[in-house]
Amino acid sequence: MNILKISKQTLTNNIKIIREYVGNAKICFPVKANAYGHGIEEIVENTHDLVDFFAVANSLEAFRVTAITKKPVLVFGVIYYEYLERMVSENIRVSIQDYDDIEKLEQIAKELNKKIYVHINVNTGMNRMGVCYNDVCRTIKRAYNSKWIILEGVYSHLACADNRDHPTNAKQKKRFSEIVEYAKELSQDIICHLSNSYGFLGDKEICYDMVRPGILIYGFLPEFYVERSIREIKPIARLLSKVVKIIELEEGDGVGYSMIYRGFDGEKVAVIPIGYGDGFPRELGDRGFVNIDNVMYPMAGRMSMDGLTVSLGHNEHNVKVGDVVELISDIPRNRNSAFLMAKQVNTIEYDIMSTLNDRIIREVI
């Protein structure tokens, strides 16, 4: 059985540190992609009293959040009109991505006789989603003056927040500051938000009314310098499994598909029941490490859909069937941390964690 163990104390402490850092800004907690692989239900249940908003990528994720909490939920993605009636009934916040969205929303709101909460997503330079920068002011004004729309927020997203010196940051910040000025002239109550985790860590001046600390709450820090208080943030989860079988190799034996790993006579190999079918990175096969009783062991051979193997050498530490295996550590410097695993396979921690699927149990402790 594979379990992602989540520390409620660490989760709570991370939010507390961020809260102190951003001052009066609200916290909108992104829990998209199954809370970056940590489990929407488990994370929302244990944080809804600590944050002001939640954010998700789509309607179906939003419904999972509203089943647990009455806190506002913002959907970042496009509007799926087949789900809009339920979204409106549950007061889920919709993102306007184009000026024409307003007319469609007004028509549906009239039919339902219920106002729709919206946040206008502004394309300040990322060029992925959002209202065109040159079309923003009329979109804001139209939404603000609508009888059927409640303009709750205006936001954008930084394309290069992980690189503080990238020139795109200055361009986007300048554009968004102009938008904020326009929106606030209409109403001081409009919530303006720009910064994800790396955004406000790189520039504390752009917290505005709300920040969106996703990866930071889950415990992953940027590689650029941050203040000492932020360095107290820790990963909230460990991925654990157990040894289910130990095999002794004979001379010439290989392990796993294609026999890419060849052991030595008498070598012990442990079988762990987790594989790429669980969302564990296949690229780590024959490259990654696991921790058994505070000893690091290398993976041996290709990872399969449902299992991986590790070399115990001569098994000097007497690893046994049933021993706990730590696959992902909550200590960043460990070779099996999400941070160093990501480095090994040329990806990011978000990718390592968010691909873990529902074959893995989530447990908050």
Curated annotation (Swiss-Prot):
Pathway named in the protein's UniProt entry: Amino-acid biosynthesis; D-alanine biosynthesis; D-alanine from L-alanine: step 1/1
Cofactor(s) essential for the protein: pyridoxal 5'-phosphate
EC numbers for this chain: 5.1.1.1
Keywords assigned: Isomerase, Pyridoxal phosphate
Keyword Isomerase included in the entry's annotation: yes
UniProt-listed GO biological process terms: D-alanine biosynthetic process
Gene Ontology, cellular component aspect: cytosol
Family: Belongs to the alanine racemase family.
Name of this protein: Alanine racemase
Gene coding for it: alr
